[in-house]
Every structure is written in structure tokens, then in C-alpha cells.
Amino acid sequence: MEIRKLSLSTIRSIITSLSVLVLVISASATLVRSTPPNVLEQVLASGELRVISTNGATTFYEGSDGLTGFEYSLLKGFADSLGVNLAIENQADTRELLHAVEQRQYHMGSAELTALESQDYHLSFAKPYMQITQQLVYNHRLGTPTSIKDLKGKEVLILADSAHSKRVARLQKKFPNLTWRPIENGQMIDLLEMVHKGEADYAVIDSNAYELHRYSYPRAKLAFDISNPQPLAWAFPHSKDTSLFDAAQRYMAQIKRDGSLAQVTKHFFERHIDEVTTGEAMVFAYRLQNRFPQWSDAMKSAATEFDLDWQMLAAIGYQESHWLADAESHTGVRGLMMLTKRTARAMGVNNREDPLQSIYGGAKYFRMMLDRLPERIQGDDRLNLALAAYNQGAGHLEDARVLTQRMGGNPDKWEDVRKYMPLLSKSQYYSRAKHGYMRGWEPVQFVDNVRNYHKIIAWHEQQNELRLASYSGGALSSLHKAPTETAAQGENLSL
């Protein structure tokens, strides 16, 4: 084969072309490498969503099982949807929080933020997760105000440096005779407590805060809204890179569509306590603080031994005796848990007026009532049916379940059983029952009352946790990093 010789100029031309090609390829590679990942890609790569928030009742706090709270649950759900951990840092000062988000020190901010209080910052807000209004509350001993004009010459508390102060500034121009007293470094719960105790006549608080704390402060009554609904939403740094913002928008749309948002909102804010009047709630709250503590350790110990909820056991004790060790009824039951002679003997209780024996006997008996129910009955139905049995005996409960089935209801569902149980006080029904007559309305009321007292006890317990969380948060440095989700197990909203 003949090999043609290349001229020197041709060789130089080829070398030059190859050099140019190498430079082009190198430049292209450098260009590709120099394109930074977007914010969402950065979050996914780091495995962590960094959020700045404010430690408090409606945002996040340390519960018995780790971090929890309304906004925490939403944030945890968002982080889970991305497959990353959630890291929350606490910042008590809203202005500092907004500034930190604006400066991209965090991926996002979540602390009951409204556009009104954030208008001085360059931020983008996602779809709102809640609408709130600013509401006037008043002490119950006063007449109910019906409009702003009724507050002429009165002093109204507000939180300093909040959306309220901006709203008040506008109201003062329209109503110059109003007197507003700003409270520095306070929280909604502080204003509500001051009104409840009579230390203040009026205050302006957010509607979600009122809903959350209303049963703890029954003397603070709701008057009217003083603002239009304001949307609460997550805040993001304003940027052309909307990757994480868009992901949040999709997540918020999803949880609204599938009902998850409504579910978590109900869990944290809807605390319906039916048939407990304001007076009864106040008496109960007083006794919870002044009478119950002496039995608290025994209740918790007995509940642990018999695998019960101590708050439920305490609620039973209150319904039975108002936590009085020497209580006695006209039917002969006595003691803190109001045991009959036969029940006390079966539970190994020698002295029904011995509060420790009574508590342990009551706990053992309630556990027995729970265990006697068919395994297929679970959840609230199991609890409620066991409570009815505790009150009237397992035999009467079985009669009620048989009657319920005969009447076309479901004997495993408390809502059906409670409907037919009162019929067993009528001869046409109890004459056919194995265990005869029963005061059929009593177990229904018993269950309702116990469940209501249980809600109040659980609510007060949560309030203690919230208050500890709030003030422990304030005692920390102004910017305190909370644990990440590697260990914390809070309210989970996974999609």
C-alpha cells in the first residue's frame, strides 16, 4: 500500500484543528459543570429541608413523642413528600425570621405568616393553608360589645409589632377615641389569659389562637371579628428559581384535594366539648389543679400496670367521685372510683375508701371490661362500650348490644348502641332482656361525660406542654436549632 507523505503545513493544520476541537469540548464540559443545581435539587441532594419558624402552640413544639404542632405537621408532610428530613430552627422575632428567609439563609419560613406583616420584605407566598381573622375577646363579666364603637374609652390589649398593630393603626384613624395597649414580647395565649383572669377587659387575638385555647380560658368570650380573613402561607425568598416554591404549591394543592389538610386542621383546632357548661368547665379546671395532683401518681402508675390511658382513668375517677376518696352514692357504691362491694371484692379491694386500692381496683375493672369485648371491636367504639360496661356492668351492656342488633343496628358501634340502650328502662324491652331493667340513659350520659372530661384533661396537659415549649423556646438563644427528623417522631402528614 502506498502511504502518501503529508506536507508540514498540512500536519500543522490538522494539529491546529484538533486543538480547537479539544478546547470546544473542554469549554462545553466546563459550561455544563458550572450550571448550578436549582433549589429543589439542592434540597434533594442535601437530604434536608431547612425551615425557620417560631416555637409556639400553633407552629411547632416539643411534645411527649417529639416535635409536633399544626404547622410542623404540614412541614413534615412536605419534607416527606420530597423524601428528605425536616430541620426547623426557632426564631421568636418575626422581623428577623422574615429577613432570614429573604436573605436565603433558609429554604422557607413558616410561622403563621401573612402578606400584611410581610409586605416590607421581598418574599413569595405559597397557596394559603388557613384563613384567620383578628377577633375581639372580652371578659365574661362585661356586656357583649357588638361593634368597635362600643369600645370608646376602653383599653384593648394587642400584641406589639404584629399584624394587629397595623390593623389598629388604621382603626385609630377612623376611631381616634380608642385606646390600644401593646404588649411587648407576649403571645396570644398571654392576652387570652389576662382577659380570662380579669386583668384586662378586652384583647385582640387571632381566630386560630382563640379556637385552640378557648376551653382553657372560658371567661374570655368572643365578641366579633375586627378584620377581613387573612391567608396564612409559607414564605419563600423571591427568586427566578421557583423549583422549591412550585413543589410546595403542588403539595399544598394535593393535601387540599385529598382532605389531608382538613384532617390535620381538625386534629389540632376542633376541640368540641359538648354539654360542658362554662361553669362546669371552670370548676373542673380548678379541681384539676387543686384536687387531682394528690392522685396523679397513683393514676399514672395504675394506668401503666393495666395498659390504660391515665387521662381516661382520671376522667372516670372524676365522673365517679369528683376525685373525693370518701365519696358515697345512694346506691351503696363508694370510694374514689365508686366500686360496688361485689366489684371491689372481685378486684381484690379490701377497703373501698382507701384511695390507692380504689384507683387500682378501678383500673383493673376497666381493663377487664375492655378485654371482655370481641377483638373485632376497636378504637373509640371499644373504649365507649367498655365505659358503658364499667358504669352498668357487662351483662347490661350485652343486653343493649342484643337489643341493638334486634332493632337493626350494629352492636359493635357505640353510636348505634347508645341509641337503643335507653329503651332498656322500658318494660316492653327489658322484659325480654337477660339481665332485666337498667337505667338505660345513665351509661349514655356517663360515657359522654367521661369522654368530655378526658378531652379537658388531655387539653390541659397539652396546654402545659405548649406553655413549657413556648417559654423554654424564649429562654433559649433567639435562634435555636431543633432536632431534625432522624429521631423525632411527631405528627406525620405523609403523602
From Swiss-Prot:
Superkingdom assignment: Bacteria
Enzyme type, top EC level: lyase
MF-aspect GO terms: peptidoglycan lytic transglycosylase activity
Region (Non-LT domain): 30-273
Span list, region LT domain: 274-495
Entries under CDD domains matching the protein: MLTF-like, PBP2_YfhD_N
InterPro entries linked to this entry: Lysozyme-like_dom_sf (IPR023346), MltF (IPR023703), Solute-binding_3/MltF_N (IPR001638), Transglyc_AS (IPR000189), Transglycosylase_SLT_dom_1 (IPR008258)
SMART domains: PBPb
One Gene Ontology term, aspect cellular component: cell outer membrane
Catalytic site positions: E320
Cystine crosslinks: none
Keyword set includes Lyase: yes
Catalyses which reaction(s): Exolytic cleavage of the (1->4)-beta-glycosidic linkage between N-acetylmuramic acid (MurNAc) and N-acetylglucosamine (GlcNAc) residues in peptidoglycan, from either the reducing or the non-reducing ends of the peptidoglycan chains, with concomitant formation of a 1,6-anhydrobond in the MurNAc residue
Chief subcellular location: membrane
Family: In the N-terminal section; belongs to the bacterial solute-binding protein 3 family.
HAMAP family: MltF (MF_02016)
UniProt free text on domains: The N-terminal domain does not have lytic activity and probably modulates enzymatic activity. The C-terminal domain is the catalytic active domain.
Designated name of the protein: Membrane-bound lytic murein transglycosylase F
Gene: mltF
